[in-house]
């Protein structure tokens, strides 16, 4: 299973809250800076089980991941968490309502390669030190066939995310806002010009 999320709400706490509720999974992120490696190791020690890492560095996956290596790292849990609004790797542009949304294709391609479920997941802060984790409807498996229907997958994920985001718009992180671009008010027949403008920002 691959859980995809956004830079929304207290996203940094999501891996720990999932583990606290018995949902063991590994989140993909950029490598920790050297000055924080000691703290990172300490955090890992507080988040059992020890044989399933809390985080997996993007450098460990690489641009051409070996599935056997990833399965070995994930261990028996087989769960991976990834952000889809990061400006890293191959990108996909999906029109949604009055916006053009940029998303990374890595989680989608990995789910297709692993034949894994792709599930939208968001965490929100409902009050001080109170959080709710929202699991959306998984992406239909036929969208993940070979080749995957990227636009259909992107639209499905955005529809699921929007049900939560519209209730808590103040919890949008700046990185999430940077992944959204306004569409012209009168619409556009060819999105390529809008995509080009977005890529040039």
Give the label of every model feature segment.
Residues 20-24, 47, 63-201:
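Non-catalytic C-terminal accessory region of glycerolipid acyltransferases
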Residues 1-60:
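Catalytic core of membrane glycerolipid acyltransferases/transacylases, capturing the structured
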């Amino acid at each position: 299973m691959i859980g995809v999320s956004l830079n929304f709400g207290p996203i940094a706490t999501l891996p720990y809250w999932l583990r606290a509720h018995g949902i063991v999974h590994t989140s993909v992120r950029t490598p920790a800076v050297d000055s924080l490696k000691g703290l990172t190791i300490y955090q890992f020690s507080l988040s059992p089980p020890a044989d399933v890492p809390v985080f997996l560095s993007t450098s460990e996956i690489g641009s051409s991941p070996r599935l056997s290596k990833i399965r070995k790292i994930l261990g028996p849990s087989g769960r991976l968490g990834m952000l889809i609004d990061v400006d890293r790797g191959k990108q996909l542009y999906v029109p949604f309502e009055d916006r053009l949304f940029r998303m990374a294709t890595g989680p989608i391609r990995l789910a297709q390669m692993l034949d894994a479920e792709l599930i939208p997941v968001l965490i929100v802060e409902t009050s001080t030190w109170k959080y709710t984790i929202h699991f959306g409807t998984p992406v239909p498996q036929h969208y993940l066939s070979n080749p995957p229907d990227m636009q259909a997958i992107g639209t499905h994920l955005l529809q699921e995310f929007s049900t939560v985001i519209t209730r808590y718009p103040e919890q949008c992180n700046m990185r999430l806002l940077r992944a959204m671009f306004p569409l012209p008010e009168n619409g556009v027949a060819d999105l390529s010009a809008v995509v080009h403008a977005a890529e040039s920002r």
